[in-house]
Amino acid sequence: MDRPHSRGAPPSYSNYDEDPDELRLGPAGNPAAVRLLPASSFDEEIPETRHSRPTHRAYQPSVSSIHSRPSSISNIPSMPPPTESYVSYRETGSPTRPWTPSHVGRSSDEYRRAPPSSVHYERADLNGSPRPGTPSSRYGGSPRRPLPPAPLFAGPGARSSAFADDATVSIPLSDVDDPFGPGSADLGEARGHRGSYAAQSQVTLNEDDDEGSHLRESDIGYDEADAVDEKSAAHYGPAPAEGDQQRRGVREPQKSRKEVQLINGELVLETKIPTILYSFLPRRDADEFTHMRYTAVTCDPDDFVERGYKLRQNIGVTARETELFVCVTMYNENEYDFTRTMHAVMKNISHFCRRSKSRTWGENGWQKIVVCIVSDGREKIHPRTLDALAAMGVYQHGIAKNYVNQKAVQAHVYEYTTQVSLDADLKFKGAEKGIVPCQMLFCLKERNQRKLNSHRWFFNAFGKALNPNVCILLDVGTRPGGNSLYHLWKAFDTDSNVAGACGEIKAMKGRLGQNLLNPLVASQNFEYKMSNILDKPLESVFGYITVLPGALSAYRYHALQNDANGHGPLSQYFKGETLHGQHADVFTANMYLAEDRILCWELVAKRDERWVLKYVKGCTGETDVPDTVPEFISQRRRWLNGAFFAAIYSLVHFRQLWATDHTVARKVLLHIEFVYQLLQVLFTFFSLANFYLTFYFVAGGLADPLIDPFGNRIGLYIFTILRYTLILLICAQFILSLGNRPQGAKKPYFASMVIYGIVMVYTTFAAFYIVIRQLTDPKAKLEMGNNVFTNLIVSMASTIGLYFLMSFIYLDPWHMFTSSIQYFMLLPSYLCTLQVYAFCNTHDVTWGTKGDNVMKTDLGGAVGKGSTVELEMPSEQLDIDSGYDEALRNLRDRIEVPKSGDSEAQMQEDYYKSVRTYMVVSWMIANGILGMAVSEIYSDRTISENYYLRFILWSVASLALFRALGSTTFAIINAVNIAVEGRVRLSLKLPTWLGGSRGSKSAISSSVGSGTSIFTGLGEKITATLRRR
């Protein structure tokens, strides 16, 4: 039965039945042959005494499963053929339907088809094959069940069985398609002649080792479980004893053995997408929309191109230049985190396509963007995330293999150009919501080898194959703004000296800011905001941002490349992946915990180059922050250790700047920044002692009977209790950090943070009381000099006042009112709990991937000789559709996946622990000596006479003023750029006789580029002047 072609169907589907034994494999122009395995008995004559066996409604013709047992019915003795009066046996549970399609065309009203129902049900068949029946349908129930909700952009035909248009796949009925009709007994013979979108059944004929009998096509898909008697049909039987049970109505995929031609000795397959997805696609005019491409990569990522692997953007009609390459790394995040990020990325791609006046982008701008998703470990990925990828058409279950010709597969690469997206609520969005096609590349790594290895696949394997201009790095869970990716790309387009850029990372506050009710989330919100207002703009003015966060950052691919000798930013960046044991000292190992900081330094200090890093204010991204104490401590451990040791590395190697091609002005600015960083490192190292001394002198001021606000020496008692409590708590913090994980000591860590908060509240109360008493005391003189007013009031007011001032300048002051109190209350925990735990765990430099080097075999393999391999694949289109249907149902029902327990902590090397001990002892002794010495020297002096407290307060105020000056400079430069760009755009709109430059679009990039390079141009002028002299 030939299927009528719909108007929108691509040629590949309409001509699919010309060769039923051919499967599309590999790129265009190099098709791979797929043929049936020969069987010695294929040409033997089939005995005439063997009659067709009647089948019941659950009968499903398909290929022979290699997992099913041989049918014992096929070995029964020969029986004479039935007479004309023979009536086929029909099970009592199968109703007689006089309007079955087999009787269509009869004149009697008895055989007329019933009118269509108004309730939307699934068809009884799919692509000419029966729907997988549920247990109830096997024993007489209706096989029809309500359809899942169709995508919003599906046409009427996709949402109603009563309509059909060019967006639907027409699946006509025939006598042989009805499992209830009398012609169903001859399904095996008729099935081979049907024509539809689905691939024809592939049959493997093999000799039976036991009896020497041969499989017939009518035997395919039939086993002993299909022979159901009346007694078993009465009920479902006893409940399953144990183990996972398959969902009712889900068809178990059938597989057949096929011979597949290898491409350059590697396994590359192209399979059709599921029918449901195909039915509502807006575009079906190319293979990239109708076929998914799978590649089993058996080499190291560094050898990807050399081994001859190619991506779709390198071959055939899809060969394109890549301007923007987006990397999304994930580990075990759930489907909500993934869809939140992926849907935001697709909306950003739509923004590129809406820029119709751009010389680079436009309606087909999506062809210049490739989104690469790298998952760290096949056994670590969340099952529902795989379902989300399958719903988008990027992933299909049952295709991947563990090995190809005894070579272990290192990564599974899936390529597909999807036209649908899933939002954070798991709802389909398509062209009606502005979603454009998106070229997706899904790399599922076989083993868990951490994030750095995922970036090596991205840069050294796929990046080398595509050679993009700009690479953007994202973490799953981060939601970029609607035009954030465009602003990141624009920073590289307007300034050719920019090698890296980052945006503003925001803490996800939830609906109506409800997450801010958690003090931990509120404190991180304040920290992120002040970093984006003070730190990032300051470093951007200097040209060196110490860290471009991996959650939202971008790099120029050309700037990352190594030199001819193999030395450069990428070689240093990936050096941390091979550091193990005593081959790397603790300093280097901890430094590469923040390898992105090393990459930033290597870019700025690259020999004979003048690369700079830039902060893009218009680029924003929301990310979920830790909301529990154990998760928060574990995250900050790696951040603090990596930042501390990476800062020391850059300070020690600052002389590399002298070999760069930076201007004199830029080098002067960078040296000023290094002095600032040196002070920051020193304050970080002595932060424990400085906090204790601040508490000792400020809170101890209330112990003076002349100042005591409570009287009766109560202030002295409170101070004494809190002082010894703080000392004991710091000692207990060392014990906790050395012997317990945060996940195993939640209550002690939480209690310590509460006590630190109480200490901070009392210290803040003491400071405000002293300030108010000083202001209201008529004997006190409010004048600048060596007094309490100058040392305490002015220094503290300037620090907090600068925070408010800069927040208002950037028009973002709300965090000062909603999150500042929580941050200052948790500030002692930042200085003590986090810092102590980080230094006490400098030995912890592993990522928990030891022992994960055994080749898995659960997916099967591709085995053969020469350039031909034999492998198992889904045999019918129905198998592909069933997997897609199950993925949609899993997403709709939101089935929870059991969470695996924490794995046992791996033993660390004695070398790391011994060095950790020496470092912790040195750090503890240094802070102890400073605290005891200063407290003894100034124990009997007032605040106005305490020079160390004065130094601490004014140092904090000075650093805050320095950051505010840099932030203000950045704001001025940003305002100038906006003004210049606005003026140029206005001049383009004006005619020439009014002073405009209509038609000269090149003026935009040149003018804006000059505006963003103020300091670069100034430095070049100074350098030229010095050379002339």
From Swiss-Prot:
Superkingdom of origin: Eukaryota
Swiss-Prot/TrEMBL keywords: Cell membrane, Glycoprotein, Glycosyltransferase, Membrane, Transferase, Transmembrane, Transmembrane helix
GO BP terms, alphabetized: chitin biosynthetic process; mitotic actomyosin contractile ring contraction
Biased segments, Low complexity type: 61-77
Any one annotated GO CC term: plasma membrane
Inducing factors: Expression is low in vegetative hyphae, conidia, appressoria, and infected rice leaves.
Primary localization class, coarse: membrane
MF-aspect GO terms: chitin synthase activity
Enzyme type, top EC level: transferase
Disruption phenotype: Leads to increased sensitivity to Calcofluor white, Congo red, and Nikkomycin Z. Results in a 20% reduction in vegetative growth. Reduces conidiation over 5-fold. Does not significantly changes in the chitin content in vegetative hyphae, nor in conidia.
CDD domains cross-referenced by the UniProt entry: Chitin_synth_C
Membrane-spanning residues: 639-659, 681-701, 716-736, 752-772, 791-811, 820-840, 918-938, 952-972
Leader sequence segment: none
Protein's membrane topology: Multi-pass membrane protein
Catalytic activity: [(1->4)-N-acetyl-beta-D-glucosaminyl](n) + UDP-N-acetyl-alpha-D-glucosamine = [(1->4)-N-acetyl-beta-D-glucosaminyl](n+1) + UDP + H(+)
Location of the region described as Disordered in the Swiss-Prot/TrEMBL record: 1-160, 174-216, 234-257
Subcellular location(s) per record: Cell membrane
Classification via InterPro entries: Chitin_synth, Chitin_synth_fun, Chitin_synth_N
Skewed-composition ranges (Basic and acidic residues): 244-257
EC number: 2.4.1.16
Glycosylated residues, chain numbering: N348
Function as written in the Swiss-Prot or TrEMBL entry: Polymerizes chitin, a structural polymer of the cell wall and septum, by transferring the sugar moiety of UDP-GlcNAc to the non-reducing end of the growing chitin polymer. Plays an important role in cell wall integrity and has distinct functions in invasive hyphae and vegetative hyphae, but is not involved in plant infection.
Homology family: Belongs to the chitin synthase family. Class II subfamily.
Name of this protein: Chitin synthase 2
Origin species: Pyricularia oryzae (strain 70-15 / ATCC MYA-4617 / FGSC 8958)
This protein's encoding gene: CHS2
